[in-house]
Design a protein with these regions (language model features):
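Short, charged amphipathic recognition helices of the HTH superfamily
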Residues: 122-133
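Short, conserved catalytic/metal-binding motifs centered on acidic residues
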Residues: 45, 115, 128, 149, ...
């Protein structure tokens, strides 16, 4: 007689995470974490497949998907891509059904960000793989070649640059703006840094040009205006003494611009036209004058110095007199000493310029201006994350009051001229 008793169906054993004792004892903690993590990932993927397809060996006519073996995939781990076995699921009509965990872990953004961060701290594309923590031997890793790292850096920074150069700046209440240029290969990158009412610094824009000329600077300022920068109220501009930059600011802001010439650049220009034996005494005299909060007294000291140099060193005397009043602008505004020191020079933006120079010196082959712009913007954005408030920021309300008074004088000018 035929036995019609059905055999009990096999039940799927729920996945469990376990390691043998020798593995725990012999592996270091770093390798152990990776090993356990990869096992947990495989079990999580299999659990998600079971939720979609139902338990193994149990027939369910109403199930929405079925198992379809596995294939070799890749995920991001520790700054590189690693090969991982990916379970596959198919719908009744043959379409691939994605597993949520795999979709989330297969994002490329973490890898792009890691490559960008490594390069911005000075790791070259050739040494990128050596900068990463080693993985256990049983994990197959790839994607750390210099060309792969370079492609990720370009991809990540290109998206950041496009967003950075188009973002609105009208919602940043500014009291001062600094402009300076840095040479990157055959290109000049003009950088604008603004200081808001709380003393925080903001990289507002970057412009690429062949030289630090008025046209390039004007285009940068016009771009900032189109992105929301107000040109209808007075603003303090701290410049290095470049006539091209000053002309461009005057073209865009007109009389609303108050100019502060950098005293460090002024001192450097004067000393370059003097013999070395005079550097110490002239530097001391200029520093003593600029350390005063009395603009009239400082101007008198500097004019006396120019007269003493006029006979033997007329070039140095002329350099000292040129734009002298604009090196004392912040002194005349009656600001506190700490804020005067912060705004009397372009040191605040020079630190950023130095970061750009340091990183650009590592690049051996500059392909074009777009590459130079991308590197400059990436460096500027990275440096901006570490910006601190300027010293003397509590005195900014006094600066804003002085700027408002300047606006009021400009508004009364037509009335005085008519009278």
């Amino acid at each position: 007689m035929r036995n019609t008793t059905s055999k009990p169906q096999q039940k799927e054993v729920p996945p469990s995470l376990c390691l043998t004792l020798p593995a725990i004892v012999t592996e270091d903690l770093y390798s152990l974490v990776h090993t356990v993590g990869m096992q947990a990932l495989q079990q999580l993927l299999e659990l998600e497949r079971s939720q979609l397809c139902g338990p193994r060996y149990q027939h369910d006519p109403e199930r929405a998907a079925s198992r379809h073996g596995s294939t070799q995939g890749a995920l991001v781990l520790g700054g590189r891509r690693v090969r991982v076995k990916r379970p596959r699921v198919r719908s009744p009509d043959g379409r691939e059904v994605p597993l949520p965990t795999w979709e989330r872990f297969s994002e490329h953004d973490p890898l792009d960000r890691r490559a960008t961060e490594q390069m911005l701290v000075g790791v070259s594309t050739r040494k990128y793989a050596r900068s990463l923590e080693p993985l256990p031997d049983d994990i197959d890793a790839f994607g750390t070649s210099k060309s792969a790292v370079s492609r990720r850096f370009v991809k990540q920074t290109q998206a950041q640059v496009e967003q950075f150069l188009c973002r609105p700046v009208g919602d940043i209440p500014l009291c001062a703006l600094m402009l300076d240029g840095v040479h990157v290969a055959e290109h000049v990158m003009l950088i604008a840094v603004g200081i808001d009412l709380t003393g925080n610094k903001h990289v507002l824009g970057v412009r690429q040009g062949a030289t630090e000329n008025a046209t390039c600077c004007r285009e940068l300022l016009v771009d900032l205006r189109e992105r929301g920068l107000c040109t209808e109220r007075s603003l303090l501009f701290v410049l290095d003494g470049s006539k091209a930059l000053r002309k461009a600011v005057g073209d865009v802001f007109g009389k609303r611009a108050l100019f502060q010439r950098c005293r460090v650049h002024k001192q450097r220009n004067v000393l370059e036209q003097l013999p070395k034996e005079l550097h110490k005494s002239v530097r001391h005299t200029m520093q003593q004058a600029y350390s005063s909060l009395d603009a009239a007294r400082a101007k008198k000291q500097l004019e006396n110095l120019a007269r003493s140099l006029e006979v033997d060193h007329p070039g140095a005397a002329a350099s000292l007199r040129e734009g002298l009043d604009e090196t004392l602008t912040v002194m005349r505004l009656g600001l506190c000493e700490a804020l005067v020191r912060s705004l009397m020079s372009t040191n605040l933006i020079e630190n950023l310029i130095g970061s750009v120079r340091k990183l650009s010196a590592r690049v051996q082959n500059w392909k074009d201006g777009q590459m130079a712009l991308r590197w400059t913007c990436a460096t500027a954005m990275d440096a901006a994350r570490r910006f601190r408030r300027i010293k003397g920021h509590k005195g900014i309300p006094k600066l804003m009051q002085a700027l408002s008074e300047h606006d009021h004088k400009l508004e009364l000018e037509p009335q005085r001229q008519a009278a």
